[in-house]
């Protein structure tokens, strides 16, 4: 069994924010793969389905980003999951737009959603880091992630969300390198190759 967690803030005010790309991804995973209707559970919204013959719960915490760990802990305890069973999809400013990297454990690079999850369940869960780019200076980061994607960005955002959802079964099977590869090649084929910049996070 796997728990897929999309990070974001609840409500229409935030739904187009860069910080909410995790919500966008799990919404598309549930839609594309015919998961059950969303319902209120675990201090958030949850849906359930099957990927790669494995039961998968997708969760969108309704606790706001800074308290995401409360919802994740509820689900982990209910299903008696290990950290390795948890996959968190989140925005990553230290990656260029449209770039995706998967990592296990490590630093949180100031991401309050990850900080909360690590405080509640430990640090050795898997993270799917969805590049949204950096505004250039630290002082602009808060506004950058809490602003909507620009109109000019929407085409690559839609392509990335679709591509990640399409290949989500590889994450269930813990084939993280294959997942990264598939997403990269698919985005290239769609004309949205990342800029090749190396990530700055451990």
Curated annotation (Swiss-Prot):
One of the protein's GO biological processes: rescue of stalled ribosome
Catalysis: reaction(s): an N-acyl-L-alpha-aminoacyl-tRNA + H2O = an N-acyl-L-amino acid + a tRNA + H(+)
Keywords: Cytoplasm, Hydrolase, RNA-binding, tRNA-binding
Location of this chain's protein in the cell: Cytoplasm
Site (Stabilizes the basic form of H active site to accept a proton): 91
Keyword tRNA-binding: yes
GO CC, any one term: cytoplasm
InterPro entries assigned: Pept_tRNA_hydro, Pept_tRNA_hydro_CS, Pept_tRNA_hydro_sf
Catalytic residue list: 19 (proton acceptor)
Residues flagged as site, Discriminates between blocked and unblocked aminoacyl-tRNA: 9
GO molecular function: peptidyl-tRNA hydrolase activity; tRNA binding
Enzyme class, UniProt record, top EC level: hydrolase
SUPFAM superfamilies reported for this sequence: Peptidyl-tRNA hydrolase-like
Superkingdom of origin: Bacteria
Binding site for tRNA: 14, 64, 66, 112
Keyword Cytoplasm listed: yes
EC number, UniProt record: 3.1.1.29
Record-stated family: Belongs to the PTH family.
Task of the protein: Hydrolyzes ribosome-free peptidyl-tRNAs (with 1 or more amino acids incorporated), which drop off the ribosome during protein synthesis, or as a result of ribosome stalling. Catalyzes the release of premature peptidyl moieties from peptidyl-tRNA molecules trapped in stalled 50S ribosomal subunits, and thus maintains levels of free tRNAs and 50S ribosomes.
Subunit comment: Monomer.
Identification of the protein by name: Peptidyl-tRNA hydrolase
Organism of this sequence: Nitrobacter winogradskyi (strain ATCC 25391 / DSM 10237 / CIP 104748 / NCIMB 11846 / Nb-255)
């Amino acid at each position: 069994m796997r728990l897929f967690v999309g990070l974001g803030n609840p409500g229409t005010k935030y739904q187009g924010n860069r910080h909410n790309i995790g919500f966008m991804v799990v919404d598309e995973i549930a839609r594309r793969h015919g998961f059950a209707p969303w319902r209120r559970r675990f201090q958030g919204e949850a849906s359930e389905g099957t990927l790669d013959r494995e039961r998968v719960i997708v969760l969108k915490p309704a606790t706001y980003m800074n308290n995401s760990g409360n919802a994740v802990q509820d689900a982990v305890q209910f299903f008696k999951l290990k950290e390795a069973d948890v996959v968190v999809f989140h925005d990553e400013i230290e990656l260029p737009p449209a770039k995706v990297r998967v990592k296990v454990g490590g630093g949180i690079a100031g991401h309050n959603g990850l900080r909360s999850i690590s405080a509640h369940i430990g640090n050795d869960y898997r993270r799917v880091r969805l590049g949204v780019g950096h505004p250039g200076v630290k002082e602009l980061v808060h506004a950058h992630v809490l602003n909507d994607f620009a109109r000019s960005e929407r085409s690559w955002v839609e392509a990335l969300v679709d591509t990640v959802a399409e290949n989500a079964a590889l994450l269930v099977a813990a084939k993280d390198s294959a997942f990264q590869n598939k997403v990269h090649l698919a985005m290239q084929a769609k004309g949205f190759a990342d800029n090749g910049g190396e990530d700055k996070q451990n």
